[in-house]
Amino acid sequence: MRIVFFGTPTFAVPTLKKLLANPDIEIITVVTQPDKRRGRGNQLIPSPVKQIAIEQQIPVLQPKSVKKNARTLDFLRQSRADAFVVVAYGQILSPEILEMPRLGCINVHGSILPKYRGAAPVQWCIARGEKETGITTMLMDAGMDTGPMLLKAYTPIALFDNAEQVGATLGQMGADLLLETLSKLDRAEITPIPQNNDDATYAPLIQKSDYLIHWQDSGRRIHDRVRGFYPHALTTFRGQPLKVMATIPLEDLGQLPPELQTKDLSHLSGEVGSIVALWKNFGPVVQTGEGLLLLKEVQLSGKSPRSGGDLVNGSRLTIGEIFVQ
């Protein structure tokens, strides 16, 4: 089977590797986003997908606009591909491109459609407190993740799973599900199922404002957003930005690590956003709009991530100090 692979981030790498390892599949070319300047040296850095393609000596196309680039469109028209596989590519394909391959354009999407259509399904699913997610393969149409569904696979989200961890799990699941999808499509063993638009929810591009912690929210809601937007959740402390990397909501002692289950919380309260306890081996405890939140891992501006316990021991925190949105 001849495949053109469209993908960009780390999430897409397991699927590309799985396809490359299959002797019945030929990757004609990889289409990925243009290199981006990153880091202190402002160097051009290739996407994770491009790096794999280069290692495997697969031709790479990087149009700024896949819909308008004449060279890319000519190549795709002449590719004689059986399918275009799209995994977190980052650009919308034109109706012309969607109609080119024999089996269509097959997307590996990081949610259980029609929930969490859009650019950031893994992050928003966790940020909104979902306890289950998964992968959907679908035939792409002109809409944003609106095409008929092919196969689904499910996985639970644990209380302390973050977007990086769930994304890694889904990336591997997507690779397996995509191979099964291609095989069954080729043998006409799948009946595409239309999505119910009434059940749709959305996962838009994440904005910098989404990273800001609102301490008036409940501890559980803040915890979910810290996990979902990992490692970017942000507050202000002593006039400086502070990333919050991991938290523990103290709402249900039974869900806490054993060493915390015996803590007496009955006397802890204070102004929203303030430190109400300093647990030397664990971290500061902060009053939220509803409940208490332990800061388990943080990152001061310009520093490496550190445990909440290290913050307590090394920063001379005091009860009553305020974290600001």
UniProtKB/Swiss-Prot annotation:
Please report which protein family the annotation says this sequence is part of. Answer: Belongs to the Fmt family.
Which SUPFAM superfamilies is this protein grouped with?
FMT C-terminal domain-like (SSF50486), Formyltransferase (SSF53328)
What the protein does?
Attaches a formyl group to the free amino group of methionyl-tRNA(fMet). The formyl group appears to play a dual role in the initiator identity of N-formylmethionyl-tRNA by promoting its recognition by IF2 and preventing the misappropriation of this tRNA by the elongation apparatus.
- Chain sites annotated for binding (6S)-5,6,7,8-tetrahydrofolate: 111-114
Catalytic activity, EC: 2.1.2.9
Arranged from A to Z, the UniProt key words for this protein are: Protein biosynthesis, Transferase
Entries under Pfam families matching the protein: Formyl_trans_C (PF02911), Formyl_trans_N (PF00551)
Q: What is this protein called?
A: Methionyl-tRNA formyltransferase
Q: What gene is behind this protein? A: fmt
Q: Which reaction does it catalyse?
A: L-methionyl-tRNA(fMet) + (6R)-10-formyltetrahydrofolate = N-formyl-L-methionyl-tRNA(fMet) + (6S)-5,6,7,8-tetrahydrofolate + H(+)
Q: Which organism is it from?
A: Microcystis aeruginosa (strain NIES-843 / IAM M-2473)
Q: Which GO terms describe its cellular component?
A: cytosol
Top-level division of the source organism's lineage: Bacteria
Q: Which PROSITE patterns match?
A: GART
GO molecular function terms attached to this record: methionyl-tRNA formyltransferase activity
UniProt-listed InterPro entries: Fmt (IPR005794), Formyl_trans_C (IPR005793), Formyl_transf_N (IPR002376), Formyl_transf_N_sf (IPR036477), Formyl_transferase-like_C_sf (IPR011034), GART_AS (IPR001555), Met-tRNA-FMT_C (IPR044135), Met-tRNA-FMT_N (IPR041711)
PANTHER family given in the database record: METHIONYL-TRNA FORMYLTRANSFERASE, METHIONYL-TRNA FORMYLTRANSFERASE, MITOCHONDRIAL
Establish whether keyword Lipid metabolism is in the entry: no
